[in-house]
């Protein structure tokens, strides 16, 4: 009887152990690219088109690679009415997921194939109930889920939606993302986004690419210095079509990503040189602390001249609307004006270390976005002021209370001068 009882208990122990076995997903070699698309807004169709061009870019890959897209679009979306993570894995021979290159090429060539059919070949890895995807906890959960779904040696991440740099969330402006209609206040704040990225990936993302307007400013880059190695962004508006992913995607998987930041930016400018407008910069976020110190040194050494710099004489990058006017000015031009006409060599050298590559369209289709190349450095920055209009009062208060660049770059120590 005892023998039978022993065998019974042993069997129970064996099966209970079987149930508790944890399968650890295999880590994939190389880099996986994540794309976080806030698409419940006027960019819905453009972001959907971006996924198709991303697929074309994956088809050009010579090695296997994975792209995971988080999509939070309109409830009426045919493909994905609910927020979800969608996976696209190329075999390095033009095939994606279970479909061969020939099959995908035929689908793309067939005029009867809809965009929904094309992007619908993605594997849905996880669905979510309706949620506000600009909330900090939601962003953290989703990006963590994306990384868990496809464990890799490293990651790069793309953010696609509306944007307006470091600005606080008010009617007409949004730091990054818009989850809802045109006037929705459901947007993400850059300090919160940076904290999310630091939390989910302490080893840092290889890059952050902002496919969103006006993210190319010192305030944004500085927040990301402990979250990403490199950042690609525009200080101007980005046309709705976004990045030319068909040509850019293969670069995003290269091991030595720093060597391909230039080609990524060049492809962007080449794409818009004759059909749009734009600026683009690739920034080494590891150099942002040094840049903050360089700016701080100049500001503190020239405090008496702060009041003499007229921002009306500077190139400002909030060109698309009066709501954005003054959000960022050219950093190099400002420092030069502050120093009496010429920026110090040590500052200029640090700026060159920080901005690895930058360019702009020389003949934009809209004169609104024409750039003064003689006063363009690829790095925007906010210049606080004593204006008492509601816009600037809100901006200055948020700048002082929430943006780390304010304290790092010398503005906090000189408030008694510029704030009066």
Question: What is each of the regions a protein language model found here?
Answer:
Residues 1, 5-33:
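Bacterial Sec-dependent N-terminal signal peptides
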Residues 21-73:
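Acidic/polar, low-complexity intrinsically disordered N-terminal segments immediately downstream
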Residues 25-26, 144, 148, 172-210, ...:
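Terminal, contiguous helix-loop blocks that mediate binding/assembly
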Residues 29-32, 62-67, 151-156, 202-207, ...:
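Loop/turn elements at helix/coil->beta-strand transitions in domains of secreted/extracellular proteins
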Residues 40, 44-57, 136-148, 217-218, ...:
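Short alpha-helical segments and helix-capping/turn motifs at coil-helix boundaries
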Residues 42-47, 76-80, 165-169, 215-220, ...:
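Extracytoplasmic/secreted cell-surface and envelope-processing proteins
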Residues 73-75, 82, 86-117, 131-201, ...:
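Catalytic-core segments of thiol-dependent peptidases
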Residues 120-129:
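Short glycine/proline- and acidic residue-enriched helix-loop micro-motifs
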């Amino acid at each position: 009887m005892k023998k039978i009882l022993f065998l019974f208990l042993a069997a129970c122990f064996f099966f209970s152990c079987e149930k508790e076995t944890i399968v650890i997903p295999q880590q994939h070699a190389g880099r996986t690219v994540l794309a976080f698309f806030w698409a419940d807004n006027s960019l819905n169709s453009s972001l959907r088109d971006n996924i198709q061009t991303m697929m074309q870019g994956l088809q050009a890959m010579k090695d296997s690679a994975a792209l995971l897209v988080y999509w939070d679009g309109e409830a009426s979306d045919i493909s994905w009415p609910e927020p979800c993570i969608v996976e696209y894995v190329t075999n390095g021979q033009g095939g994606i997921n279970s479909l061969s290159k020939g099959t995908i090429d035929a689908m793309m060539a067939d005029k009867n194939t809809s965009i929904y059919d094309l992007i619908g070949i993605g594997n849905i890895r996880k669905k979510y109930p309706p949620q506000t995807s600009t909330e900090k906890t939601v962003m953290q959960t989703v990006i963590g889920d994306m990384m868990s779904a496809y464990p890799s040696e490293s990651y790069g991440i793309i953010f696609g939606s509306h944007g307006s740099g470091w600005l606080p969330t008010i009617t007409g402006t949004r730091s990054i993302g818009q989850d809802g209609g045109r006037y929705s206040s459901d947007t993400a704040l850059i300090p919160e986004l940076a904290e999310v990225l630091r939390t989910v990936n302490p080893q840092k993302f290889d890059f952050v690419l902002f496919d969103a307007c006006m993210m190319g400013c010192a305030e944004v880059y500085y927040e990301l210095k402990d979250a990403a190695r490199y950042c690609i962004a525009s200080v101007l508006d980005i046309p709705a079509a976004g990045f030319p992913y068909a040509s850019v995607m293969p670069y995003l998987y290269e091991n030595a990503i720093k060597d391909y930041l230039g080609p990524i930016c060049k492809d962007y400018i080449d794409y818009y040189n004759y059909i749009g407008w734009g600026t683009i910069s690739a920034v080494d976020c590891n150099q942002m602390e040094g840049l903050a110190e360089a700016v701080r040194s100049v500001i503190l050494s020239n405090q008496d001249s702060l009041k003499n710099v007229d921002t009306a004489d500077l190139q400002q990058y909030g060109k698309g609307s009066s709501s954005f006017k003054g959000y960022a000015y050219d950093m190099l031009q400002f420092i030069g004006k502050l120093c009496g006409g010429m920026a110090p060599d040590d500052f200029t050298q640090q700026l060159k270390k920080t901005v690895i590559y930058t360019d702009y369209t020389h003949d934009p289709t809209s004169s609104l976005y024409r750039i003064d190349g003689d006063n363009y450095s690829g790095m925007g920055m906010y210049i606080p002021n004593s204006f008492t209009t509601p816009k600037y009062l809100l901006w200055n208060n948020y700048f002082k209370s929430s943006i780390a660049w304010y304290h790092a770059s010398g503005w906090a120590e000189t408030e008694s001068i510029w704030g009066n």
